[in-house]
A protein has these predicted regions:
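Cleavable N-terminal export/targeting peptides
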Residues: 1-50, 311, 316, 340
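Transmembrane beta-barrel domains of bacterial outer-membrane proteins
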Residues: 35-173, 265, 273-285, 316
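Transmembrane beta-strand segments that form the barrel wall of outer-membrane beta-barrel proteins
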Residues: 55-59, 140-150, 176-187, 197-237, ...
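Structural signature of outer-membrane beta-barrel domains
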Residues: 58-62, 98-104, 147-151, 185-189, ...
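Residue-level signature of outer-membrane beta-barrel architecture
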Residues: 83-85, 130-132, 168-170, 184, ...
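Repeated loop/turn-to-beta-strand initiation elements of outer-membrane beta-barrel proteins
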Residues: 87-94, 135-141, 174-180, 208-211, ...
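Outer-membrane beta-barrel "beta-signal"
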Residues: 198-202, 286-296, 302, 323-340
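Outer membrane beta-barrel transmembrane domains
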Residues: 219-221, 227-235, 241-313, 318-320
């Protein structure tokens, strides 16, 4: 018998206005990616999606650029949108939007080409996500996002960004599972434009442990005590996230951690279509999250960013071309999130 598929969201004008506002907000799109989203996508739970909207702004202190005697000021923006479109206990459709941006004020130039440094770098993506539970207990699905990552997004097809993943979750006992997947991206740090297979094992012996380890990623969540959580994730080749958090009071969470991350953008009017402008940085940070409503939170944090640099090339081997080194320095960050 064909199952009826129930809609879980009404696309009301207010929510769509918020969504479009993030895209049009001073050309400042961003992108929030959380470790919890990895766990959700590969988890055995289906049909529990909620509408989600997060936005984060991170201004950095003005710093010097090595060898150019120029100042560099940057504010980083992130946002994440998820709209469940239809779901039941065995099937779910959702729409995912990710937005990332750097608002930049500087007179720095790219040293090899002598071009002025972009005053903004934006990454805007949107696409569907699908998951289904089959009669044998397997879960299969995937997602596809299409967008543009550039100083001038959507200026031409040369700035188009495409990411796609297909996966299967194969149960191994009551709580554990194998995960096999195939991913493609034209804006990946390594093996760019290459369909990349992967395999991992989901190990969850209790509610205190969740380990997803394999190729090409690893994710670990551990709760040694009721109010203490530890998280770690790794993505090849230079993306690391580690965090420890403590539930101080019921609505208050304090945390600290380390991030090593990177971003890539297709500059408009670049000479080589395979080149991207890369940004790398490491962060140490601490913060507090206040769940002021059951479905809303406010997050304030501060930290120190170091090993910050940009370069232009096809991959990390080109890291000395058009390289711009930004001095280490502090930053602050504010994030708000809503669940409906």
């Amino acid at each position: 018998m064909k199952k009826e598929f129930s809609s879980s969201v009404a696309l009301n004008p207010l929510f769509l206005a918020l969504f479009l506002g993030l895209i049009l907000w001073g050309a400042d799109p961003g992108d929030v990616r959380a470790q919890s989203e990895i766990a959700r996508f590969f988890s055995p739970e289906i049909g529990l999606l909620k509408r989600r909207l997060d936005f984060q702004a991170t201004p950095y202190k003005k710093e010097d650029v090595t060898s150019q005697s120029k100042d560099f000021r940057m504010t980083h923006y992130n946002a994440f949108l998820m709209l469940p479109l239809a779901q039941d206990r065995n099937e779910e459709w959702s729409l995912i939007g990710t937005f990332r941006g750097q608002g930049i004020k500087t007179e720095v130039i790219l040293p090899d080409t002598k071009k002025g440094f972009p005053d903004g770098l934006w990454d805007v993506r949107l696409g569907p996500s699908y998951r289904r539970r089959f009669e044998n207990g397997w879960i299969g699905g995937g997602f596809l996002t299409l967008g543009s990552a550039s100083d001038r997004p959507f200026a031409s097809m040369e700035e188009t960004e495409l990411q796609a993943t297909a996966f299967a979750r194969i149960p191994d006992g009551e709580r554990n599972a194998w995960v096999v997947l195939l991913t493609y991206s034209n804006n990946r740090e390594f093996l760019n434009n290459v369909p990349l297979p992967g395999i991992a094992y989901w190990y969850e012996p209790s509610d205190r442990y969740r380990i997803l380890i394999g190729f090409p990623f690893a994710s670990i969540e551990y709760k040694p005590y009721k109010d203490v959580s530890m998280e770690f994730s790794y993505f090849p080749i230079r993306s690391v996230r580690a965090r420890v958090s403590y539930r101080l009071l019921l609505p208050l969470l304090v945390y600290g951690g380390f991030d090593w991350r990177n971003e890539g953008y297709f500059l408009a009017n670049r000479h080589d279509r395979w080149d991207r402008l890369f940004y790398y940085e490491k962060r140490l940070y601490a913060g507090v999250r206040w769940d002021f409503l059951k479905q809303a939170f406010l997050d304030l944090s501060s930290g120190y960013a170091f090993d910050r640099f940009y370069f232009e090339g096809s991959d990390y081997e080109d890291r000395d071309h058009n390289r711009v080194n930004v001095e280490n320095g502090p930053y602050v960050s504010i994030q708000a999130g809503f669940r409906f």
